[in-house]
Amino acid sequence: MGIKKEHVVVCLGASIMRGQVSSNFVGDLEARMGKDGFRFINHAVAGYEAYNVLVNLDATIDIQPDYVIILVGTNDVTASLSPGVSRISRLMKKIPEPHSTAFYRKNMSQIVHKLKKSTMARIGIVSLPVLGEDLETTPNLRIREYNAVLKDIANREQVSYLPVYEQQEAYLKQNQDHAGREYRGGVKTSLVMLIRHFLFRQSFDTISKKNGYTLLTDGIHLNSRGAKFIADEIELFLREDE
């Protein structure tokens, strides 16, 4: 029996990709695909924006992975929704420009350019998940604007676009008989979620149900159902060459 070739997959992003305060779909992918030679390296860092991924990209390039999966931008969006959050974010994360779709486009384009120039990796860009579950509120309208940027970059650069938002949107429309709970900003719901999970050992699914969400836990992070959409899209992308 021949030895299976190892496929190294680097995952870039923030807390949703990191999977510590959100359902761990990278761990799920390891369980699904590890036996087939896929090795996942999670370089995501909670709080990162696209700019932070860009300036720390050399660590990924040094690995020379076979695949790179990028899911980053939710923090860019939440900062763009609030001048106060934007100011704090720029100060704490050393973001050099105001938050905008143009700044996001510049950073994401440079990430893809640098990866294409310095590696042979196949690149998958994951569309940003829903932000709150009322699809017609400003947060989700903004998410769709940022996802349009991602889709355009993917088309221009001939890399793969993984339509997670689109799948989640379709699921919510099919399974909700009224508008879902909206994302209101602020940190209270997220802090309570963290206390419930890490102090009282409640699962993300239990917290999600108590908070009245279908795919999310606190309006941003994912329960297991929400995370499965991402895992499924990534697995589909990774298995295309098999």
Segments from the language model and where they lie:
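Serine-esterase "nucleophile elbow" of acetyl-processing enzymes
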Residues: 1-67
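Alpha-helical cap/lid subdomain in secreted, periplasmic
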Residues: 2-5, 35-36, 52-242
